[in-house]
């Protein structure tokens, strides 16, 4: 499997409903863009974490269970990595894109540009561009919470992927995007928010 992921990589054979819905959304958006000449930029987010995040995300559930003294399920024995991207870096990237809408007359200026040839449409990765192993992420949670984690090692989940890593160089070339938050700092900020918000 090719890592890091680029916007122009083929994504035609999804192995989960989650991935299928994301691909379907991109296809529908491209159709709208083509039919009505509507400028659209689709963003592929890479494992966003931080305050006010989705409670169903692993880092959120881990934190909740650790504080309750419950075991946390660690799939594939933790032998996987993700491109954890802090919310502040995500919002910074989105803000930089606001005046960079694709146009029908645009020409591909960059190598591996995902700009459509028939619509004002482009797909962009937005990630931290660094691989963080799951166990390193969990160990940092443990340190910041000051609690020993009870771990329940599980096999790989059906439909899950071993690793994700973004190539966000196209976004950087278009906007100057440059994620700055180290995952340890991001976790520290998240834990501070979580304890204040929920306790």
Give each language-model segment a name.
Residues 13, 21, 51, 55, ...:
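Residue-level signature of the cytosolic catalytic core of signaling kinases
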Residues 50, 54, 83-86:
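Active-site helix-initiating loop/hinge in glycosyltransferases
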Residues 1-42, 53-54:
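Catalytic helix-loop patch of NAD(P)-dependent Rossmann-fold dehydrogenases
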């Amino acid at each position: 499997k090719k890592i890091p992921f680029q916007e122009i990589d083929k994504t035609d054979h999804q192995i989960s409903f989650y991935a299928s819905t994301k691909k379907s959304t991109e296809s529908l958006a491209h159709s709208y863009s083509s039919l009505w000449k509507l400028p659209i930029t689709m963003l592929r987010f890479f494992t966003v974490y931080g305050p006010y995040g989705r409670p169903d995300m692993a880092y959120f559930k881990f934190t909740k269970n650790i504080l309750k003294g419950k075991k946390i399920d660690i799939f594939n024995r933790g032998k996987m990595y993700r491109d954890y991207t802090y919310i502040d870096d995500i919002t910074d990237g989105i803000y930089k894109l606001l005046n960079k809408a694709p146009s029908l007359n645009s020409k591909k200026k960059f190598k591996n540009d995902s700009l459509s040839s028939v619509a004002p449409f482009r797909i962009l990765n937005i990630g931290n561009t660094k691989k963080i192993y799951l166990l390193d992420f969990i160990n940092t949670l443990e340190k910041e919470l000051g609690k020993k984690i009870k771990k329940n090692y599980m096999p790989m989940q059906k439909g899950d992927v071993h690793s994700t890593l973004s190539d966000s160089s196209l976004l950087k070339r278009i906007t100057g995007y440059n994620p700055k938050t180290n995952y340890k700092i991001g976790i520290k900020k998240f834990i501070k928010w979580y304890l204040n918000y929920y306790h």
